[in-house]
């Protein structure tokens, strides 16, 4: 009898708890929905709301253009039935407050942390928040600062020269069509290998096979970018991750009969295995010192050597443990490779499309080289105005990441630079963001805003940086760790490697332009850059960017 009563009580108690949780969730959803219901936005097209449009590889850019044309810098995006709608934001003043004054009130959504923990480990920079994230940035900031980066140019030049040796062989008999997507992936991976982690990941020889990790990483990003994957990450992944151990979650993922899951799983496991192996080799070389370090491809000048030397192999209470250091290895490989590949390939494509800029840039760099003894110093590269303009304009118009999600941890009121008209017809000069609301910060939206940049905002025009910028840019209060663009974000979660990317890209482009000439092929009109977590060029559904290449 007592057992029956206890079971009956347990069932009733469980039911009561479930009802209370459901009631709390419904109340929270109604609270959020009611406070943002006056924000205009597109009507949902299905039970998924506008989610499939927002994350569509084929129609994503078209959807972005439509909502900007109709709703401006702020709109409400419908999500799957039963979920809270999100706020799409491209207003510079509101974004300024999100990234600066009110940055403590926002963080990455929970599902982003879960996804990054599965890919990068529980202790990677992208997977942490709060005090732990602040601690990591505090010791990582100097590693990405000028004092360490001054050792990078010789490493970057060495990679660039190997890449150009391959191009000279391929173009020895004259102009030929080359898939630059293939080579862009290889050279960007080797930049990370040489400068960031201190290993040769690709010899860049034309008769050598490319490192499979680069291709797997590209496929992994494409798989993670599909609407189905984004839905799973947002609404399913956090639930299973909170149920059991990581070992159980991996076992559960093995049961999912999906090619996308297989691609991502293989990519993650390859990343984890490579990172652990390379970390141990790096640590052993540091412990041996002397010849062991000089035998490494980077001669011990890479960023991970600095991190291990100063924060792992030390006798301090705040030392970094090996699991965290391995997570930082994975983070560098994961974050840097595809970002730099996207920027490199986009710049090359734009130079092919604008032969006048290509010629002017070649003349600027050759003039600087005439007075130099060997490779240009990084200080001289920084002083080249057109090179800087090409770099800034490319990353303004084509940021590697189109948008970033943040979730409000408390109610926030954000001022608007450009007031909007609510659904009820009232003018709104500020935005009320309820606790728990996801805000999609549109990097591409604010970088391309005609209200800020003028009527030619959608035109690639490096010359805009060679004259005083419009007053609308100066007065916009646009956030950004680099001047006037939001590509590398701002505040506590800005991109730590922005100087690294700038150095890498300027060195590579300066040498490429002096050695090679690029022109479009007959397939050029077919080159597309589908919407995704990061951006890569495709032709007829295959990752590719064919260009005519010849020696300059």
Curated annotation (Swiss-Prot):
One of its GO terms (cellular component) is membrane. Pathway: Secondary metabolite biosynthesis. It catalyses: (-)-cyatha-3,12-diene + reduced [NADPH--hemoprotein reductase] + O2 = erinacol + oxidized [NADPH--hemoprotein reductase] + H2O + H(+). Gene3D superfamilies: Cytochrome P450. Glycans are attached at residues 50, 447. Heme binds at residue 495. It is a single-pass membrane protein. The chain crosses the membrane at residues 9-26. One of its GO terms (molecular function) is heme binding. It comes from the Eukaryota. Belongs to the cytochrome P450 family. Cytochrome P450 monooxygenase; part of the gene cluster that mediates the biosynthesis of erinacines, cyathane-xylosides that show unique biological activities, including leishmanicidal activity, stimulating activity for nerve growth-factor synthesis, and agonistic activity toward the kappa opioid receptor. Cytochrome P450 monooxygenase; part of the gene cluster that mediates the biosynthesis of erinacines, cyathane-xylosides that show unique biological activities, including leishmanicidal activity, stimulating activity for nerve growth-factor synthesis, and agonistic activity toward the kappa opioid receptor. The geranylgeranyl diphosphate (GGPP) synthase eriE catalyzes the first step in erinacines biosynthesis via conversion of farnesyl pyrophosphate and isopentyl pyrophosphate into geranylgeranyl pyrophosphate (GGPP). PANTHER family: CYTOCHROME P450, CYTOCHROME P450 12A4, MITOCHONDRIAL-RELATED. This is Cytochrome P450 monooxyhenase eriI. It comes from Hericium erinaceus (Lion's mane mushroom). The gene is eriI.
